[in-house]
Amino acid sequence: MQSCIGRGTILIVEDEQLMLRLVEKVLLQHGYQVLVASDGEAAIEVYRRHKLEIDVVLLDVGLPKLTGWDVLLKMKEEKSDVRVVIATGFLEPKMKTEMSRVAVKHFVDKPYMLDEVVETLQSLIDAPVASSGSNTPVT
């Protein structure tokens, strides 16, 4: 894995505990601040408490209690310019189109390629916010 120094705070939302702990460990080793949630309701609770600190959310689609889609919409209500990377083993084209419509531009496949996850998260943290008033990153 390529070495880089991470900056920023990342919320990982993942219901598979082994995957959650692995990604958390890798991100911590890269220097990121990491928050975690293992279901949709916990994700919303953590996000509401820390939304001003969180730079990017790594969001699994298949979650218990609330789906990743529901979590995404609630996060957008809290902070319209939330930056999200969707993680999924399979995403139907219609759902991907809907997520893209609400400004999700980054998707990573599961099982994770950890280098890809780190690079994608850092590129989103580094991306400037559009000045057109849309509050979405320029990507």
Protein language model regions, located:
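Non-catalytic signal-transmission and effector/linker regions of two-component phosphorelay proteins
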Residues: M1-L11, E24, E45-R48, E53, ...
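Conserved acidic carboxylate
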Residues: E14
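The feature encodes the CheY-like receiver
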Residues: L20, P64, E92
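Charged docking surfaces used in two-component/phosphorelay signaling
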Residues: R21-Q29
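Short hydrophobic/Thr-rich beta-strand motif most characteristic of the beta2 strand and flanking loop
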Residues: G31-D39, V46, V108
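Residue-level signal for the "D+5" position in two-component response regulator receiver
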Residues: V36, L63-L66
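Acidic catalytic/metal-coordinating carboxylates
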Residues: D39-A42, T67-D70
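Active-site residues of response regulator receiver
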Residues: D60, T88
